[in-house]
Amino acid sequence: MTDNSRPLAIVTGASTGIGYELALVCARNGFDLVVAADEAKIRQSAEDFRKAGAQVVEAVETDLATTEGNDKLYNAARALNRPVAALLANAGRGLGHAFLDQDFAAVRHVIDTNVTGTLYLIHRVAKDMRARKAGRILITGSVAGYIPGSFQAVYNGTKAFLDNFAFALRDELKQAGVTVTVLEPGPTETAFFERAGMLDTAVGAGKKDDAAMVAQTGFDAMMRGDGDIVSGWKNKVQTTLANVTPAGVLAAQHRKMAQPGSAKK
């Protein structure tokens, strides 16, 4: 028998990587789940979440870059007739290479996934949370948001937006019983760099953080109601230095890590 008193969480980008690990952590900590991704693998991942402890797992294959795709996810959660206790807005997409060498349709897809789709889903779910005066929101930003990202200009720009948006929304909701936390990981061992076409870069070929560790860090921060959390001590040092380093210097440093072929230098 399903226990409807269990909290319900929505996790986006949950088929692989940080989103997958976030959903696992939620399942192990008593949450039921509505999970979404733009690939059929989300249904296979849903089985892992059930084994981890979630009694109810609704898997939604949908395009999170579109309002229609996010409506599909929102309606799937609403159909359960249970309040959403937590929204983990993790879906994101990267894109390497110089901005003028990128296909603009791919540029638009990054912006639509990372920013427009994320904001649209938050707008829908957070309204319900505000009406109930209860809820938790975790937004996956990035330490990339602190750095002008040469050869990752659009991606870093989207993460800078999310990092700032999260704090603004948190302030707007501080009297509403709804917390907003932004998780800011550094390079993490996922399929991100392969999908972004960055395996030949220094950052793509370099050592990365463990996705399970990053997810646990973010989940714990969300449950505490923290404003932000940078995962990993090296990333904490990087963001601290980024705050006092000229933007031009940061962009030049990023070039060394993200320029195509930099893995061979």
State where each predicted segment sits:
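Conserved glycine-rich Rossmann-like NAD(P)H-binding loop of the short-chain dehydrogenase/reductase
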Residues: 29-45
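Conserved NAD(P)H cofactor-binding loop of Rossmann-fold oxidoreductase domains
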Residues: 90-95
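Substrate-binding pocket helix/loop in short-chain dehydrogenase/reductase
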Residues: 98-111
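Active-site helix of classical SDR
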Residues: 122, 158
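Conserved glycine-rich cofactor-binding loop
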Residues: 15-16
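C-terminal helical subdomain
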Residues: 182, 202-239
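Residue(s) in the substrate-gating loop at a strand-loop-helix junction
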Residues: 142
